[in-house]
């Protein structure tokens, strides 16, 4: 399990920009990605990147009361965490939970990276031992 506190991410709409037929990471997106890498680098020794199936649980604390779609912040966070070496590839994420929390100045995002299978739901604590088992 890895717990991370990150700055509030730009939405997907601001994370990428389009130039002709190419899609690039915007200046704001590169700044966010650099900040995430710097925060994780300052945390001392870490485990090597997670290589198996994982769950990501995010608590989003927005910077203000504007209307925001939670799914618009997920991609930028996934991209930054992969770039920072938290896991090898976005395709490892089998469970992605995001919940909106109260407004805090400047906003922030708490992220928990968990190895699958889970015994308990990280949000409600209910039993998950049989979820996804066929």
Model-found features: residue ranges?
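Acidic, proline/glycine-enriched N-terminal capping motif
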Residues: 1-134
């Amino acid at each position: 399990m890895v717990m991370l506190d990150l700055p509030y991410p730009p939405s997907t709409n601001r994370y990428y920009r389009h130039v002709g037929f190419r899609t690039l990471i915007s200046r704001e997106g590169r700044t966010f990605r650099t900040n995430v890498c710097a925060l994780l680098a300052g945390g001392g020794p870490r485990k090597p990147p997670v290589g198996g199936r994982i769950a990501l649980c995010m608590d989003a604390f927005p910077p203000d009361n504007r209307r925001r779609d939670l799914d618009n912040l997920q991609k930028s966070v996934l991209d930054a965490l992969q770039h920072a070496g938290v896991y090898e590839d976005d395709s490892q994420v089998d469970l992605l939970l995001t919940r909106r929390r109260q407004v805090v100045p400047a906003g922030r995002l708490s992220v928990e990276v968990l190895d699958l299978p889970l015994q308990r739901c990280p949000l409600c604590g209910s039993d998950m031992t049989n979820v996804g088992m066929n």
